[in-house]
């Protein structure tokens, strides 16, 4: 006999919890199913914990819109709930005159997304960060950092206070739309029937979608796993802001981020791997970090970088093998399965966008 429930959210990362919160605060009955032993153990626990301002994302994209909306919501939420965070700011730096044009392009693009940046010449940037080497920089005052675990605790508390439930060790075996409801079979044989199901399973979202009977596989993108390695600094860094090199074709470059204790870490790089469980950091990869970091911090000492941790970006690709660069929020209007919303490719800025994503999904299923 199936147990009836209004809404099921599969995945208790920061986005799944934000979706569950948005639904619960609207009076919906919510059950969150998490395969792991607790919430937020994968992508949500292995990132830079940066609150992004929204500089780089294509204008009109979900990433651009939800990042800007989510950033405002996140700062307000953290202040209201006393969640540790800091609006420390970020400098995007050009380390050669040839990069000035690229830096100007970043400034213009950010402005198109509604994000104002301050142009700094060498001396102005050095006045903010004396150890920095650059020819020019952009100052993003609205970039910050957040304690992602404390954030998820707050979101979960909101869900539970509104009557929602988190069930851990609850992997989903398959789903099917039948008898005017989404039927969910857990690995332990539990059978649930739900009006609304949100697939917020992160790295596992495409695989879960393929186990959803009645959902045409043409709607499921191909996952690929982009590992990002981080190296931590032995000792204190002489910086109080995040430092990012000017973006190049290969990505955002090896950037310096800080945690709330002031500890510096560098990364992430990009390493394509076959499995999302490949989380060991190869110390040899650190050698490539030194040359990149010294472009903007010549004072980095030999031997100062230590292997930190790694995360996996949930990249997705279309049937032709082209990268899908925007968030995919796929509701019944896209795939035709009533009551089902799939979230694919929720990589950065997923943490920043989480509260806005929750609101967006709640509106789709209203």
Model-identified regions with their sequence ranges:
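C-terminal lid/capping helical subdomain adjacent to the catalytic/cofactor pocket in oxidative enzymes
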Residues: 45, 323-366
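Short beta-strand to alpha-helix junction loop
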Residues: 58, 62-69, 93-102, 139-157, ...
